[in-house]
Amino acid sequence: MINLRKTHPLMKIINHSFIDLPAXSNISAWWNFGSSLGVCLMIQISTGLFLAMHYTSDTLTAFSSVAHICRDVNYGWIIRNLHANGASMFFMCLFLHIGRGIYYGSYLYKETWNIGVILLLTVMATAFVGYVLPWGQMSFWGATMVTNLLSAIPYIGTTLAEWIWGGFSVDKATLTRFFAFHFILPFIIMALVIVHLLFLQETGSNNPSGINPDSDKIPFHPYYTIKDALGLMFLLLVLLSLALFSPDLLGDPDNFSPANPLNTPPHIKPEWYFLFAYAILRSIPNKLGGVLALLASILILLVIPFLHTANQRSMMFRPISQTLFWILTANLITLTWIGGQPVEQPSIIIGQLASILYFTLILVLMPLAGMFENYMLEPKW
């Protein structure tokens, strides 16, 4: 009997990608986040589709249409809560996935890593335009503040900002186009995910030890499908707990008020997953300098593969690099906290020091640690 799974043109691709895929036998739970991100994307697209059926992208009715979804649409409240908190879960998995890549040296698969960074930027853009759609106070002022950063670009800045707005300020045209962007971007993300996986198939997955695992491979199914299923259960448990028990925990109270261009909130801040970059932006007094630092805080991921100086790929057996990695993690948590604080002392100086430390760790200390560890491993007799 012919095995359709291995012969059918379409099934064959799925089989080689998810069933008979040779996987390293020692990959840990840190490798679960790729599949978790895939499920997050599916949840976001499916809940988003149902929300788009009832949402109206008009400044007069956007806020009330979201209220209508929660009050009058059948199960609208759970769809909206899953979508809003699903974004937080998405970014949580993204940050852990990137952290794992840095810790275990997965960034040395340069093509996969670079597509991953492009994916991160696309997801951030999608989340930003999505946050504007409910047209609450923080939606409106967040959109005004972030799009206004474009005006810091010399010569073309103001023209560019007005082109994005579709007028002289954030208004109806802006909301309509942001809804269009928010609808199309997840499908672009899906295409990029396929490219990300294609590049990963070329090299095979990395593993905690960082050494070539070709001599010891096992099939992806059933070993890692079961393991991923456990990770997905945890993901869904946290997501459902958030959506059902405290759906507004990660939101901003200001967004319960309709957008009012005449009333500025006392403290404009983005969602929690952008706060680290927002803190870096705020730590530089100059507008253009802040925008460049904001971009650098994300694009620095692209230079990490070129800063790898250690002879070993993974940090598993490199205690100095491990220490620096966990300092970087603590530093990012500090930046996230500072980004949510009002602009006053001591928050300003803490933010500036944490921003300097962020770039110093990645650009200077981690490459130096790799070189020092190489020296320590050299035989001295």
Curated annotation (Swiss-Prot):
Binds 2 heme b groups non-covalently. Disulfide bonds: none annotated. Coiled coil: none annotated. Heme b b562 binds at H83, H182. The chain crosses the membrane at residues 33-53, 77-98, 113-133, 178-198, 226-246, 288-308, 320-340, 347-367. One of its GO terms (molecular function) is ubiquinol-cytochrome-c reductase activity. The keyword Transmembrane applies. It is a multi-pass membrane protein. Heme b b566 binds at H97, H196. It comes from the Eukaryota. GO terms for cellular component: mitochondrial inner membrane; respiratory chain complex III. GO terms for biological process: mitochondrial electron transport, ubiquinol to cytochrome c. Keywords: Electron transport, Heme, Iron, Membrane, Metal-binding, Mitochondrion, Mitochondrion inner membrane, Respiratory chain, Transmembrane, Transmembrane helix, Transport, Ubiquinone. Its cofactor is heme b. It is found in: Mitochondrion inner membrane. Its main location: mitochondrion. InterPro entries: Cyt_b/b6_C, Cyt_b/b6_C_sf, Cyt_b/b6_N, Cytb/b6-like_sf, Cytochrome_b, Cytochrome_b_C_euk/bac, Cytochrome_b_N_euk/bac, Di-haem_cyt_TM. Belongs to the cytochrome b family. Heme 1 (or BL or b562) is low-potential and absorbs at about 562 nm, and heme 2 (or BH or b566) is high-potential and absorbs at about 566 nm. Component of the ubiquinol-cytochrome c reductase complex (complex III or cytochrome b-c1 complex) that is part of the mitochondrial respiratory chain. The b-c1 complex mediates electron transfer from ubiquinol to cytochrome c. Contributes to the generation of a proton gradient across the mitochondrial membrane that is then used for ATP synthesis. The cytochrome bc1 complex contains 11 subunits: 3 respiratory subunits (MT-CYB, CYC1 and UQCRFS1), 2 core proteins (UQCRC1 and UQCRC2) and 6 low-molecular weight proteins (UQCRH/QCR6, UQCRB/QCR7, UQCRQ/QCR8, UQCR10/QCR9, UQCR11/QCR10 and a cleavage product of UQCRFS1). This cytochrome bc1 complex then forms a dimer. This is Cytochrome b. It comes from Sminthopsis hirtipes (Hairy-footed dunnart). The gene is MT-CYB.
